[in-house]
Amino acid sequence: MASQGTKRSYEQMETGGERQNANEIRASVGRMVGGIGRFYIQMCTELKLSDNEGRLIQNSITIERMVLSAFDERRNKYLEEHPSTGRDPKKTGGPIYRRRDGKWVRELVLYDKEELRRIWRQANNGEDATAGLTHLMIWHSNLNDATYQRTRAHVRTGMDPRMCSLMQGSTLPRRSGAAGAAVKGVGTMVMELIRMIKRGVNDRNFWRGENGRRTRIAYERMCNILKGKFQTAAQRAMMDQVRESRNPGNAEIEDLIFLARSALILRGAVAHKSCLPACVYGLAVASGYDFEREGYSLVGIDPFRLLQNSQVFSLIRPNENPAHKSQLVWMACHSAAFEDLRVSSFIRGTRVLPRGQLSTRGVQIASNENMETMNSSTLELRSKYWAIRTRSGGNTNQQRASAGQVSVQPTFSVQRNLPFERATIMAAFTGNPEGRTSDMRTEIIRMMENSRPEDVSFQGRGVFELSDEKATNPIVPSFDMSNEGSYFFGDNAEEYDN
C-alpha cells in the first residue's frame, strides 16, 4: 500500500476537496448528501408526488437518472449535433409511478434539461455539485453490481466469468472522476484497458495525431489508477511495463489478464462506500435533519443509521419475493455485492442469500411491463450491526503478500479467515510462462503459492452495535468457514429456476 500520506481519503475524492481534517470532511460530505436531499424534495414538489410516491425507489431512480442526463455534457453535445427524429435533445425524462384508485400507474414525464440543472444548482447553493452527481452514479453502479453478473462483458474481453468479484463499478460512466475510479475493481480497470488496446489494434489512427495523444494520456492515466490498486511490488512493476509499452497489443492484453487473475488471491485495494437512493436523503432533510451541521461519512455508521429509520417502498412484480427485493437493495446500499455472504448476513442480522436463489428481478421496471398486476411493499433496509467499509483487499500484513479472499472483494473491515482451494486458482495459471515478463510472472505466482489460506484477514476488526457510534466495542464474529460465501457463485445451492 502506498503511504497513506500521499492519498486523499475517499470522502475527499467524493467531495472534490483538497486535504481536510476529519470534521471538514464530514461537513463537506454532509453538504453533498444534503444537497441531494434538497434537490429530491424540490423534484417531488415539481412533479406533485405524494409522500408515498416520493418514497418509491423507482421514482427516486427516475429522478436521479434525469438529473444525471441533464449534466451529461458530452452526450448532450452529441445529441444536439446528431438530432434523431422524435427526440428533443434538450429534454430528458422517464417513468414516474403514481397511486390511482388503489393501483400503481405509470406516467412518462419529460423535463427540460436546463430546468433540471437550475433546480439541482439551486439545491446545492448555486454550485454544479459534481460530487453529488458522482455519488448518484456510484449508487446506480452498486445497484447494477448487486443485480447483474457481467458474464458476457467478461467473455468479450477474454476474461473468465469466475473473475466476477473483480468487476465492481463496471457500469460506472467514464465521467465519474476520482471518486468513481476509487470504487472500480481490478477487473473493471483491466476490461477498460483491454477495450482500449483492442481499438488501437483494429484502428491504425487510434494512437496517432492530436486525438491519439489525448488517448495515450488517458491510457497511461488508467494504467496508473490500476497500478495504485495493486498492493505488491511485482504486480505494480508489471503495470509499469504495460503503461510504458510503445505500441500496446496482444502482449499487453495477456499481461493484463494475468494480473486480473493474480488479483483473485493478491487482492487489489478497492474502495467501498454506502451510497443511498436520493429519496433517503430527501426524507431525512424533510424531517429537519441538517447533514452539513451534523456531518456525514459514507464509510462509517451514518448510512446504517439513516437506513434504520427510513421507509422506502418498491414496486413488486407478481412472482417476486419482497424479502429478496429488500436484500438486493440492502446490498446495493452498502456496496456489498462482492462481500462474503456470511459477513453480510451477520451484519444484516438475517440470512443473505446468493443471487441465484433470489426470486427477484432488477429494481427498475421496463416500459412494456404490465402495471395492472404491480404491487408495492416496504423495503427492509435495517441492519443488526454496523461495520467500517474497507478499501483494502483484505490482506493481513503488507510485508508478505498474504492472500485476500478468493471470489470475494471485502466491503466490511471485519475479521474472517480465507477459505480457498489454492489448486483451483493455480490451475488458472497453467499455460504460457514465457513472454517478456516471465520473471515478474514467476514472482507473482510464487507469492500466490506461498500465501497461506489459514491466515486471517482484518485481524481483530469486528462489527459494532448500532448504539456504539464511536466504534469502541468491536464484536468479532465467528463464521462457519467450511465454504466460500460468494454471492454470485461459491454457493453449494441448487440452481434457482423460475
Curated annotation (Swiss-Prot):
GO terms for molecular function: RNA binding; structural molecule activity. Residues 1-22 are annotated as: Disordered. The keyword Cytoplasm does not apply. It comes from the Viruses. Late in virus-infected cells, may be cleaved from a 56-kDa protein to a 53-kDa protein by a cellular caspase. This cleavage might be a marker for the onset of apoptosis in infected cells or have a specific function in virus host interaction. Its main location: virion. InterPro entries: Flu_NP (IPR002141). Keywords: Capsid protein, Helical capsid protein, Host nucleus, Host-virus interaction, Ribonucleoprotein, RNA-binding, Viral nucleoprotein, Viral penetration into host nucleus, Virion, Virus entry into host cell. SUPFAM superfamilies: flu NP-like. GO terms for biological process: symbiont entry into host cell; viral penetration into host nucleus. GO terms for cellular component: helical viral capsid; host cell; host cell nucleus; ribonucleoprotein complex; viral nucleocapsid. A motif (Bipartite nuclear localization signal) lies at residues 198-216. It is found in: Virion; Host nucleus. Coiled coil: none annotated. A motif (Unconventional nuclear localization signal) lies at residues 1-18. Belongs to the influenza viruses nucleoprotein family. Encapsidates the negative strand viral RNA, protecting it from nucleases. The encapsidated genomic RNA is termed the ribonucleoprotein (RNP) and serves as template for transcription and replication. The RNP needs to be localized in the host nucleus to start an infectious cycle, but is too large to diffuse through the nuclear pore complex. NP comprises at least 2 nuclear localization signals that are responsible for the active RNP import into the nucleus through cellular importin alpha/beta pathway. Homomultimerizes to form the nucleocapsid. May bind host exportin-1/XPO1. Binds to viral genomic RNA. Protein-RNA contacts are mediated by a combination of electrostatic interactions between positively charged residues and the phosphate backbone and planar interactions between aromatic side chains and bases. This is Nucleoprotein.
